[in-house]
Amino acid sequence: MQYSIKQVLSKASDKLNKIGISSSQLEARILLRYVINKPIEYLLINLDEQLNEVEIEAFEKLLERRLKHEPIAYIIGIKEFYSREFIVNKHVLIPRADTEVLVDVCVHKSSLRATKRSVAISGILSKIASSTPMASSRNDEYTKILELGTGSGCIAISLLCELPNARVVATDISLDAIEVARNNALKYHVTDRIQIIHSNWFENLGKQKFDVIVSNPPYISTDEKPEMALETLNHEPYIALFAEEDGLQAYRIIAENAKKFLKPNGKIVLEIGFKQEEAVTQIFLSNGYNIESVYKDLQGHSRVILFSPINLNRSYARRIGKSLSGLQQNLLDNELPKYLFSKEKLIDEKRKIFLEIGFGMGEHFINQAKMNPDALFIGVEVYLNGVANVLKLASEQNITNFLLFPNNLDFILNDLPNNSLDGIYILFPDPWIKNKQKKKRIFNKERLKILQDKLKDNGNLVFASDIENYFYEAIELIEQNSNFKIMNKNNYLKPHDNYVITKYHQKAIKANRIPRFIILQHVSGDH
């Protein structure tokens, strides 16, 4: 018996509609198009054309699979992604439109809107790529990308098609998925620019370094199973969907291991699940990363986050006085990430906030935090031995109300909101005695203006020095600034509240240098 295209589509659409498939008409057309190898437009203008028995039987077999909630992409074996058709089967996750945001962020000048706490970025890979010649001119000059969990390879291959001078290493734990990815690489003629590795995350990468690490990792919690579509739950690979630890396990693995595989100034671009922005950003903040941008999908949900490691090497000052001990290195590796400063950690912060610039070995810094447990203390110090000592003292005394920025002051100033600090301590900074060096002083005219803007009205700034000329030059500088009032004009020898005599203070006394203190109050004015 023969039926027309119109009759076949109508009956199939009714059956699909009865099981809750909202796009029943479209899916019926897709299945029939696949059977007769004609475009959908052909079906729409030839509704009265008769189908033969072979065509109808083939169509009915495919329809029966769809009626059992098998995804249509698996039935026809292809799925469109980023304007290309990729081979898919039950061994790989079906590419989603939301994941195109991941590629978009990497490749294009994105029109996607970053969140208010983001710096608008675009064309991450394009910027890297444009700074280097094509790979054909020099084999070592190309953008090197790592994709973790490649699945069908749709992300990696899309990037290669969009970026001619990119090279990709793509990993997956599934050998079946790797076979699919290799077939897609063959289809789009990029086999010479992609290396597909059987690996559980970073395990088999050796010592390779990458400009960008990109991933759409498994991020669904098993608790979400009751809310999932049958097509996804019963047919797509479990390992590509679900992650332990409330869906966050993969992000923890990436955050803990990615730095050693990134080149200097490298980036991480990750897709996240619905409502996971806060949890994922906290994981990366705790492991020493900056959150550079958060991008939304077409539904307005946060979908892609751009991370970069906090750079501990961008500093003008000495970083290590003597070799770090095993304990010190362990503290820097394992404890410092928990306390690393980032601007995101100040969002919705209700406590009083104090900043100490150049805390040395940290005796004063830790004592202030201990004496004021309801406040937050931010410490800036380039001397890693001192940073490690703060972490040691904090651990011994169970002090947690602090953040550390082990870098040059200038790199943190833009991340401190104006009118946010209740107090600033600048105790015994390098005096830079020579005239040509004075511009390097922490306490100079330009920085004083910036610090003034960071202080709340009536906030305090404490400056101390054991170098007499530097101290009185600082007073002259302050007297030129009408936004500060000196609170201790009659006694510069008396320190501020909760001050502890540090080792440096003791050395100054022994060397017959007198420590002096200026206690300033910020007077109400424009910020």
Curated annotation (Swiss-Prot):
It catalyses: L-glutaminyl-[peptide chain release factor] + S-adenosyl-L-methionine = N(5)-methyl-L-glutaminyl-[peptide chain release factor] + S-adenosyl-L-homocysteine + H(+); guanosine(46) in tRNA + S-adenosyl-L-methionine = N(7)-methylguanosine(46) in tRNA + S-adenosyl-L-homocysteine. Residues 314-527 are annotated as: tRNA MTase. The active site is at D430. It comes from Rickettsia felis (strain ATCC VR-1525 / URRWXCal2) (Rickettsia azadi). This is Bifunctional methyltransferase. In the C-terminal section; belongs to the class I-like SAM-binding methyltransferase superfamily. TrmB family. In the N-terminal section; belongs to the protein N5-glutamine methyltransferase family. PrmC subfamily. Methylates the class 1 translation termination release factors RF1/PrfA and RF2/PrfB on the glutamine residue of the universally conserved GGQ motif. Keywords: Methyltransferase, S-adenosyl-L-methionine, Transferase, tRNA processing. Its EC number is 2.1.1.297, 2.1.1.33. S-adenosyl-L-methionine binds at G149, T150, G151, S152, G153, D172, W201, N216, E356, E381, N408, D430. The keyword RNA-binding does not apply. Substrate binds at N216, P217, P218, Y219, K434, D466. PANTHER family: HEMK METHYLTRANSFERASE (PTHR18895), MTRF1L RELEASE FACTOR GLUTAMINE METHYLTRANSFERASE (PTHR18895:SF74). Residues 1-309 are annotated as: HemK. Gene3D superfamilies: DNA helicase RuvA subunit, C-terminal domain, Vaccinia Virus protein VP39. Residues 310-527 are annotated as: tRNA (guanine-N(7)-)-methyltransferase. Residues 1-311 are annotated as: RF MTase. GO terms for molecular function: nucleic acid binding; protein-(glutamine-N5) methyltransferase activity; protein-glutamine N-methyltransferase activity; tRNA (guanine(46)-N7)-methyltransferase activity. Pfam families: Methyltransf_4, MTS, PrmC_N. SUPFAM superfamilies: S-adenosyl-L-methionine-dependent methyltransferases.
